[in-house]
Structure formats: C-alpha cells, structure tokens
C-alpha cells in the first residue's frame, strides 16, 4: 500500500503531467501549420488578400431559415465596411408580436460585396444568431418590514416571476469578428474548429476561402439580458465589431464549445455566465496566468483536504485543540455554503465550499467523540468523556469564549437588525442566511482567537495540522487573485483577505513557540502521536 509521501508524490506527478498535457493542447489550438511553399496546389488562399470592397448588413426575422428578402427587417447597414476598424453602434429593433409571446427572434449577419444585395452575391458569407433566450427572471428583492420593492415592475412581470418559469429575454449585445490574417491553409489538414466557419470558392486554378465571419457568443452576458413582456414593441441592440487573429479565433471557438458542453451537462445560464466572465473580462495573458493559478489551486485543495482528513483520522485526543473553534468552523462553513447557494454563486466556488462543509461536520464528530448507535429505527447519540489533559484545554477554551462573547453577540445582533431595516432581501430565509454569513465574514476571525489563546497558554503549536494549514494558506493567497476574476459576493471576496491576516498570526506563533515534535509535554504525551508498533 502507498505511504502518505508516495501518494503525495504521485498526486504531484499526475498534476505535472496534466499541466504539461494541457499546455501542449493549448499550443495545438493557437498554432496552425501553414501550407508549405512547395504544395501550392493543395493550398487554400485568403479571399481577403484581394482587398475587396465589403458591406456589412444585419437583418432580423422570426424565421430560422430565409430564402429571400421577404419577412425580414434591415436594422444595420455599414457601407464601405473596413475589416481593420472596430466600431460599436446601437440601433432600435422592432419586436414582433410572435417574439413578445415568448417566440424567438433571429439576427442574420451578412458580409457581402458593396452595392450588391446579399442574396444576389454568390460570394457573400452570413451567420445566424438568436437575439432571444429563455431564463427564469431574478427574484425581486423587497424590504421585509415595509414590503417596498427595489424596482417598480409591471404586475404582469411579477406574476410571471412568481411562476418560477423561464421567460423570453432580449440579448442586447451582438459582438462580431472577422479573421483578418492573410493566412494560407493546407487544404489536406484544415483545422476542424475553423473549417465549419469557412466557405470555399474556386477562382481559376486555386481555391480561396471567403472572409471568416464569427459571432462572439462569450460576450453574451446575463447582465445584458432584458425581460421581454407583451407591451414591449422596441428594444435596443448594440452591435460591436473588432478584428480577430487566427489563434484567438480558434481559442475562442474551443471556449464557446466548452461553455455549450457545460450547459448540456446541466449548468444553468448563470453558471455558464460565470465561466464566460473569466474569458471575456480578462486579458488573454492574464487568463493564461489564471489557468496555472487555478491548476495549483486545485492541487492545493486536494492536498489540503487529504492532509486535513489524515490528521483528524489519526487524532486520538483534543489536547491543545479548541473544540469551540472546531464547532465554529463547522457552523461558519455550513452557513457560507448555504449563503453561496442562496446567492446562486458559480459552481467553481460552490462545489469546494460544499466539500469543505462535509469535512467540517465529520471533524465535529471526531472532536466531540460522537458515536451513533441504533436502537431499532431510533438513533442514540453518545459523547465520549474527556480526560484531565483535555479538560485543561477546554478550560482555556471556555475562558477565551467568555470574553469573546461580550464583543461578538452585540455586534452580530446589531448587524442583523441594521440589515433588516435598511437592506432589501428576497425572503426571510435570505435575510437570516445573510445575517449569519455577514457575522461570519465580519467577525468570524474573532472565533479563531480561542485557538490562538490556547496556543498562548500552552506555549505550543505542535498540536495543529500544519501541513493542511500550509496548503490552505497557499490557496488563500490564490483566492486573493481569484477574488478579482470570479464573480462572487463582496463579503466572500473580503473574507479571502481576512484569512491572510489570520494565517500570518499563526505563523508568528509558530516562530514564537518552536516545535519540538520529540518533546513530551507536561501531560506525558508527544505531539507526533505516532501509532505504537505491535511487539512481535
């Protein structure tokens, strides 16, 4: 059976292979092999190299397929379209009755020769995108005491929201790109991701690909959606354009496919939106750094969970450990998980919080020496007795909590009362969870003081799970970076920086009380807690 060090080495090795493989895959995505100079017959040449005069036209229709210019509306026409110049224009779009009744409205974007109608141009390229999507409206927040709402919504919208059913929303942004590189493809090995966006034409003896028109679906964010009701007749649409390189185009196609796959696996529109935000709102170079940071975060999460579980699994006594701090960590972790769940936070944050809550519940069972015996169908919970050494630790623990309660309880109660009077919530449950979590975030570090006090009284920190602490500290510093990237509640973001301060205090105590693991303390125990070897 693998030892702990071997298992850790194996995990780190697998992690290194994973990172190397991912880097190789990413290189394969952004790098495209050009057509060799000697194989001109098999090359696919760019039509844009001829520098044609182009025009951009955007139409809307309720039909997913159009054969001619009937039943379509022209909403934007850009003559003398320059593929090198970015622009952004806002137009008003008429909303048909069919769309107002939860129907779909499509945008047809044509790139064609200037002065020629799209359906009369044999070398036009076009792409289709729905301008509507279906999503459950965000619950309205009200003042729980007065019933005053944050927004004056139309009564029909309130009734629709109450049904908790998806309704039609308007995508107010349309982001377009054209691949502008004069890149010569090898016809025998066209990249599959780009190939589906390419349209070929035969010009003389050579094959050319027409301009590659692309819609950036990653820019469609939940914050830009607008609810469509029966009285809506016109809505704004912001059309923006920018050129794109081949490498970024291929990367963006893969990211869009990944987001689509997440939605097929059950991710909601909001969950997918969190992932989109990582790519759209972040510089690509910073995004590459974020990938490596996220990979290390995953590794440290795994190692922290593993070492924490290993430490508590072998823990035979609570000497030097604050039981109340363990109980508090369990309570705060569960409350934070429920809060993140209520706020519909990204699964990237929610899943680790849920795993952490389960581990903290198990640690409480170990700390209280709790056993469950079944008497028929009725469970009977029993708690183990504490020895004299553990009672001494509990005495320090109780002493710290006594003074702490004088400060903590008034602050938490006052904060909850203030938020009830001045802040609007979706429900009483939402207020209760928010009050708890604000207490956890704002004053939670105070509950770490009992453990610091126990360390001070015992003049030792050898009883703490330092390996798990170290991995968690690394993740805390990584969380500081993610706090500016991943969408999360502001209080959760501030808590990341609070944990930095707490860990620095633990480091100071470790320096102040050097650990001698071979030393037997005043209770006759070694903090190494090595299992006794059986005599042969």
From Swiss-Prot:
Keywords: Apoptosis, Endoplasmic reticulum, Glycoprotein, Lipid transport, Membrane, Transmembrane, Transmembrane helix, Transport. Residues 31-284, 343-346, 424-428 are extracellular. It catalyses: a 6-(alpha-D-glucosaminyl)-1-(1,2-diacyl-sn-glycero-3-phospho)-1D-myo-inositol(in) = a 6-(alpha-D-glucosaminyl)-1-(1,2-diacyl-sn-glycero-3-phospho)-1D-myo-inositol(out); 6-(alpha-D-glucosaminyl)-(1-octadecanoyl,2-(9Z)-octadecenoyl-sn-glycero-3-phospho)-1D-myo-inositol(in) = 6-(alpha-D-glucosaminyl)-(1-octadecanoyl,2-(9Z)-octadecenoyl-sn-glycero-3-phospho)-1D-myo-inositol(out); a 1,2-diacyl-sn-glycero-3-phospho-(1D-myo-inositol)(in) = a 1,2-diacyl-sn-glycero-3-phospho-(1D-myo-inositol)(out); a 1,2-diacyl-sn-glycero-3-phosphocholine(in) = a 1,2-diacyl-sn-glycero-3-phosphocholine(out). Residues 1-9, 306-324, 365-402, 450-536 are cytoplasmic. The chain crosses the membrane at residues 10-30, 285-305, 325-342, 347-364, 403-423, 429-449. Belongs to the CLPTM1 family. This is Lipid scramblase CLPTM1L. It comes from Gallus gallus. The lineage of its organism: Eukaryota, Metazoa, Chordata, Craniata, Vertebrata. The gene is CLPTM1L.
């Amino acid at each position: 059976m693998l030892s702990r060090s071997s298992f850790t080495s194996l995990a780190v090795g697998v992690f290194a292979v994973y990172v190397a493989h991912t880097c190789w895959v990413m290189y394969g995505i952004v790098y495209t092999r050009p057509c060799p100079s000697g194989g001109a017959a098999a090359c696919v040449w760019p039509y844009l190299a001829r520098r044609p005069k182009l025009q951009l036209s955007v139409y809307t229709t309720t039909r997913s397929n159009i054969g001619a210019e009937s039943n379509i509306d022209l909403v934007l026409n850009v003559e003398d379209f320059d593929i090198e110049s970015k622009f952004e224009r806002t137009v008003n779009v008429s909303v048909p009755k069919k769309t107002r009744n939860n129907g779909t409205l499509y945008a047809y974007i044509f790139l064609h020769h200037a002065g020629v109608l799209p359906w009369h141009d044999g070398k036009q390229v076009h792409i289709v995108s729905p301008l509507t999507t279906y999503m459950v409206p965000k619950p309205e927040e009200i003042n729980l005491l007065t019933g005053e709402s944050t927004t004056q919504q139309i009564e029909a919208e309130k009734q629709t929201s109450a049904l908790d059913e998806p309704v039609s929303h308007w995508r107010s942004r349309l982001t377009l790109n054209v691949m502008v590189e004069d890149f010569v493809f090898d016809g025998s090995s066209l990249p599959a991701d780009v190939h589906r966006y390419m349209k070929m034409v035969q010009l003389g003896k050579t094959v050319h690909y027409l301009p590659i028109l692309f819609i950036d679906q990653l820019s469609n964010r939940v914050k830009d959606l607008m609810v469509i009701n029966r009285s809506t007749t016109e809505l704004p649409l912001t059309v923006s354009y920018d050129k794109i390189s081949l490498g970024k185009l291929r990367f963006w196609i893969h990211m869009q496919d990944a987001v689509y796959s997440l939605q097929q696996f059950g991710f909601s529109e909001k969950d997918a939106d969190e992932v989109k935000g990582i790519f759209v709102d972040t510089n690509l170079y910073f995004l590459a750094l974020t990938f490596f940071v996220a990979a290390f975060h995953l590794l440290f999460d795994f190692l922290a969970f593993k070492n924490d579980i290993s430490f508590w699994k072998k823990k035979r006594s609570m000497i030097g450990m604050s039981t109340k701090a363990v109980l508090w960590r369990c309570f705060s972790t569960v409350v934070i998980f429920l809060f993140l769940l209520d706020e519909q936070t990204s699964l990237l944050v929610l899943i680790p919080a849920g795993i952490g809550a389960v581990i903290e519940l198990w640690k409480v069972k170990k700390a209280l020496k709790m056993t469950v015996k079944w008497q028929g169908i009725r469970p009977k919970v029993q708690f183990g007795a504490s020895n004299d050494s553990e009672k001494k630790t509990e005495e320090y623990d109780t002493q710290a909590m006594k003074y702490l309660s004088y400060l903590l309880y008034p602050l938490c109660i006052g904060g909850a009362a203030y938020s009830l009077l001045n802040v609007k919530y979706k429900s009483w449950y939402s207020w209760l969870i928010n009050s708890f979590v604000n207490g956890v975030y704002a004053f939670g570090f105070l509950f770490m003081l009992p453990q610091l006090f126990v360390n001070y009284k015992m003049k030792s920190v050898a009883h703490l799970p330092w390996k798990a602490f170290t991995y968690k500290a690394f993740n805390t510093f990584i969380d500081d970076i993610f706090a500016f990237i991943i969408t999360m509640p502001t209080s959760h973001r501030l808590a990341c920086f609070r944990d930095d301060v707490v860990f620095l205090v633990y480091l100071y105590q470790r320096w102040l009380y050097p650990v001698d693991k071979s030393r037997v303390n005043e209770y006759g125990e070694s903090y190494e807690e090595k299992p006794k070897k059986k005599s042969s």
